[in-house]
Amino acid sequence: MCLETIPTNNKTLALINQGYKVLAEYQMIEQKQLKGIYAIPSYSSGLLWFGVIFIHSGLYAESVFRFSILLPDQFPEESSLPTVIFQKDIFHPHICPVSHSLDLTPLLKEWKKDQHHIWHILKYIQAIFADPEGSVCSTQNGDPIPLTEVNNMEAMRLLANNRVDFAVRAKVSILWSCQHMFDEPPIKDPHYIIFERYCPEKHQAMMERLKSRSWYELSAPKTPKPSVCVARMESARQLIEDEEAQVVNAAGSSLN
């Protein structure tokens, strides 16, 4: 074995190991059977997840909010937190009106792989919309949240002093989410969560297929081998780095 190939092989093994851990995170979400919120790794990279939440009660009732979860490059080993970014600005104290990012620090300060999982983030997203007031009063540990540390001070001020005006501003976010539910995907990825308008013919055809005993065999695609799934977890940046390393090694060998 050439010594030059060892670092590249180690990186590939690390990526495969990371891919299995990401798949395990997705399986845990399925096991938790969370209601009204869904998330799935993208086809192109396991470090990018697509998510959507349906809210049926409270100040944000009837909304459908899309979001993305960006995992750190060394997930789950490194302590830095994942990044949650909503598709559109949502009027909420914990959501930045500029970047649309969600503040996760009330949930946790750093990522601990033996304690934290992506489903914790999904439950936190549910909690901030189900109880906006409660989400700004204290952290998960019961510690008070400094008012100067929220992402949207205007939303915080209205929530504390004028709930009616806060509801009006939140309604704008709700209406936008419903109006753009059926928009074309902003990214070409087979795993992006899309919605289609109700079509009676399609609905009836699907119901007939579900009544068939062989509906699963008729409709379910063949499950790819784990190695194929894991291979899809590698990000484009990491693949480029591997290719560049191989080019450098090949150039060095030719000179020798």
UniProtKB/Swiss-Prot annotation:
Pfam families: UQ_con. InterPro entries: UBQ-conjugat_E2_core (IPR000608), UBQ-conjugating_enzyme/RWD (IPR016135). It comes from the Eukaryota. Coiled coil: none annotated. Residues 17-179 form the UBC core domain. Belongs to the ubiquitin-conjugating enzyme family. FTS subfamily. This is Protein crossbronx-like.
